[in-house]
A protein has these predicted regions:
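Hydrophobic alpha-helical segments and their helix-loop junctions in multi-pass secondary transporters
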Residues: 28-40, 63-80, 207-224, 236, ...
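Hydrophobic transmembrane alpha-helices that form the core helical bundles
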Residues: 34, 38, 102-123, 150-167, ...
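Selective recognition of specific alpha-helical transmembrane segments in multi-pass small-molecule
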Residues: 100-109, 152-156, 199-207, 235-250, ...
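Transmembrane alpha-helical segments of multi-pass small-molecule transport proteins
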Residues: 21-35, 60-68, 225-251, 270, ...
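Membrane-water interface regions at transmembrane-helix termini and the short interhelical loops
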Residues: 4-11, 39-51, 71-89, 138-144, ...
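Residue-level detector of conserved catalytic or cofactor/ligand-binding positions
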Residues: 383-391
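Transmembrane-helix boundary/entry motifs in multi-pass membrane transporters
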Residues: 8-18, 52-56, 86-104, 136-148, ...
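N-terminal alpha-helical transmembrane segments of multi-pass membrane transport
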Residues: 1-133, 273
Length: 391
């Protein structure tokens, strides 16, 4: 009997090794975390300390290097390369593309950290070394969420877009992107190892984002509806909502994703406009935002290369290096999506568009929400921070 037509295409076959090995390890880890929470937390803390204290400089070098590489690619002849055929036209309108670009890097944690990240720095000795909370507490949030993080995404997005739309590779795997370097070894152990590491990185990023989203939503529900909701119940609710959104996106493809992205943009910027116009801190938000942005640009290279070699505060190890590692983890997923939706656009448009939509929207979010809460704290209108703030 001829079974030729029953065989699945190569890119649609299930890779059981990549599926079962991470699943097994995750189940084992979950059991260990549940049975030995204190010991597990101690081990994870030691691993994080080792990576930040011993290998932290490499994260900083890679972060700055990738950002500079993105600028070079966008301004060089390689920026003219079209991600697609010679006469390929963009698949999505400029607004739809930009909305999906921004929401590719948007999660619940941006709402949490836009509003409150300055609180985490307020009592840090490093801020006192630099100057005052007023001057520096709102600078680092912008730095940690803007140019270098999106540089990680956009360099890889250009590479993946070239792989998908120019080389016409259908397997959206990290190993496939490494085929020019690995050659025949892509389909062997080396390629499998790369894909396994990518899966573990994606799981780690998802877990981190999920751990931030759950308490944020619990607090919001408690404040809005005065209902104390158990974290386990909230987790189930989030999973159900996630399944609904995923199913909608699956049934409607990128058209559905585009619709959800635009709806998210309208809601998000509607919130920002409401806070700016009716929050009572418009003047403070604008003036402090301009000052913070200018200070970040003026001191960009110093912020990007500060290592605290004597460990007087360990600020870069605790924060900057942690963030760079966090963004690197999400490079497993976001660049593939950005590269996919950028079909028909040039490499230059992809990179600069990412900085315009992604970085621009992120900075606006941190300026409005962060300076709103900081202004309320400094004026005494609200006790948001864990410690009193001084000018």
């Amino acid at each position: 009997m001829n079974t030729q037509h029953t065989n699945l295409p190569e890119h649609k076959k299930v890779d059981w090794m990549i599926t079962l090995v991470p699943l097994t390890i995750i189940i084992v880890l979950c059991i260990l975390f549940f049975c030995m929470p204190d010991q597990s937390n101690a081990v994870i803390s030691q691993i994080r300390f080792f990576l930040g204290d011993t290998l932290g400089s490499y994260y900083l070098i890679i972060g700055l290097g990738v950002f500079l590489l993105s600028i070079f690619i966008a301004s060089s002849k390689y920026g003219n390369i079209v991600l697609g055929g010679k006469n390929e036209k963009p698949k999505y309108s400029f607004f739809s593309w930009g909305a999906m670009m921004f929401t590719a890097g948007l999660a619940a944690d941006i709402l949490f950290y836009s509003f409150s990240e300055w609180i985490l720095y307020a009592t840090d000795p490093h801020i006192a070394e630099l100057g005052s909370i007023q001057d520096w507490a709102s600078v680092y949030p912008i730095f940690h969420w803007s140019l270098i993080p999106w540089g990680f995404y956009l360099v890889l997005a250009a590479a993946f877009g070239f792989m998908l739309h120019v080389r016409k590779r259908e397997r959206q795997k990290y190993s496939e992107a490494c085929r020019p370097l690995l050659g025949k070894y892509t389909d062997g152990f080396a390629g499998r190892l790369i894909d396994l590491l990518a899966v573990f990185a994606l799981l780690a990023g998802t877990a981190t984002t999920f751990s931030l989203a759950t308490p944020l939503m619990a607090s919001a529900i408690n404040e809005l509806f005065h209902v104390n909701i158990d974290s386990s119940i909230l987790t189930i609710i989030i999973l159900i909502i996630t399944c609904i959104v995923y199913t909608y996106s699956l049934l409607h493809g990128f058209k559905g994703i585009s619709f959800l992205a635009k709806a998210c943009i309208y809601l998000f910027f509607g919130l920002l406009a409401f806070v700016l116009l009716f929050g009572g801190e418009a003047k403070y938000i604008i003036e402090t935002g301009i000052s913070s942005l200018g200070r970040m640009v003026q001191n960009f290279f110093e912020l990007a290369t500060f290592t605290d070699p004597q460990r007087t505060t360990s600020f870069p190890q605790n924060w900057t290096i942690f963030y760079w590692a966090y963004w690197m983890v999400w490079c497993v997923a976001a660049p593939f999506f950005i590269g996919n939706i950028s079909k028909g656009r040039t490499v230059r448009q992809t990179i600069l568009g990412g900085y315009a939509f992604g970085v621009g929207s992120t900075i606006v979010s941190f300026i409005i929400l962060g300076n709103y809460s900081l202004g309320k704290q400094i004026s005494g209108a609200a006790e948001i921070g864990r410690a009193s703030c001084r000018e």
